[in-house]
Amino acid sequence: AVNKWDLAPDLGMNRGLTEQIVQERFKFVRHAPILFVSALNGDGVDALLQTAISAHEKGKIWIPETELRLANKHFISRHAPKSSKGIINLTFGKVYQESTSPPTFVFEVNRPELVHFSYHRYLANSLRKEFDLSATPIKIVLRAKPRKGLKK
């Protein structure tokens, strides 16, 4: 939230430029909406509260594994994972939701330590878009796929 927006006209500020500045400085939360409020006169406070309530509710959503599996196939076909080492072939297996608040998604992959950090962001943003989780923090966990034939 950009507070004290009632002072903006006197400072020569406009929403478009302010949104650009906020998005540039806070790249790590581009999924979060930018809301303009003035606590002094109450402008934008209702929208802020509604957005917070909506984000909280979306954070409690549970997505069935079958839907996640289909979405994951689509994500990978659209943008194949690359290894941070460049030559290792990464293969993703099972995907499931482990918890809510924040929604935590587990992706099984053959070499999780080699998945580039930008692919974490890609998966989180793809999940947000696919399942309407905007304004909701998402946790991505990459786990090693269990090896076939090994006893636990």
What do these predicted regions represent?
Residues 1-152:
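C-terminal-of-GTPase-core extension/linker across diverse P-loop GTPases
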